[in-house]
A protein has these predicted regions:
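Acidic, low-complexity intrinsically disordered segments
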Residues: 2-191
Length: 191
């Protein structure tokens, strides 16, 4: 496996055709703030891109953000998210017909032909942060599914909905506490 550091990726001035305005969208992540948004946000911002993110599980689609984006990438970590995205993608394409549309996450390669039929230009699976960053820089990711060993950056959660809008635990005394989770692997044995 190849080891790749975020610092090894192309920096701001290297690619004149870069897609500078990036919109990442998640449709569903089991009531969690999506790591699949926070980690690529860190990579893309480090490379100098203007990144917005929307979690449609807890907020509405911002059509102005869609119109403003050069690259719109939809995160597909599971089947439910993919089904929800299938209704979203035509709306995104209609709102911004010139944007490059990507789908990334474990279920993107599994549904590649279906997603391409909906108008998706690029499909990324496996370790997708490098591919998204290359795509935003105006390049072409080397493969659909990357198995590269990445050196993850601290996730950038700025601009994402507050944690109190996600899953919580109701304690026996009625107190509501924010619930967290740890993602030790990407995906499960079924993907």
């Amino acid at each position: 496996m190849v080891s790749l550091l975020a610092a090894d990726l192309p920096q701001t001035d290297a690619h004149p055709k870069r897609l500078q305005r990036v919109l990442l969208i998640s449709t569903y992540e089991l009531g969690h703030q999506p790591f699949g948004l926070a980690e690529p946000i860190a990579w893309l911002r480090r490379a100098g891109h203007d990144v917005r993110a929307l979690d449609l599980a807890v907020e509405q689609l911002d059509e102005q953000a869609v119109r403003d984006a050069d690259l719109v990438a939809v995160y597909l970590p599971m089947h439910t998210a993919t089904r929800l995205a299938a209704r979203l993608i035509p709306r995104v394409r209609q709102t911004n017909p010139t944007a490059h549309l990507a789908a990334y996450g474990l279920y993107a390669p599994l549904q590649a032909s279906y997603l391409r039929g909906l108008g998706v230009n690029t499909i990324l699976g496996g370790e997708f942060e490098e591919g998204l960053t290359m795509l935003a820089a105006g390049g072409r990711p080397p493969s659909t599914v990357s198995l590269a060993r990445l050196a993850f950056l601290p996730p950038d959660r700025s601009g994402l909905p507050a944690l109190d809008r996600y899953g919580h635990v109701r304690m026996p005394d009625g107190e509501r506490r924010i619930a967290g989770y740890v993602e030790a692997t990407r995906g499960c044995k079924h993907t």
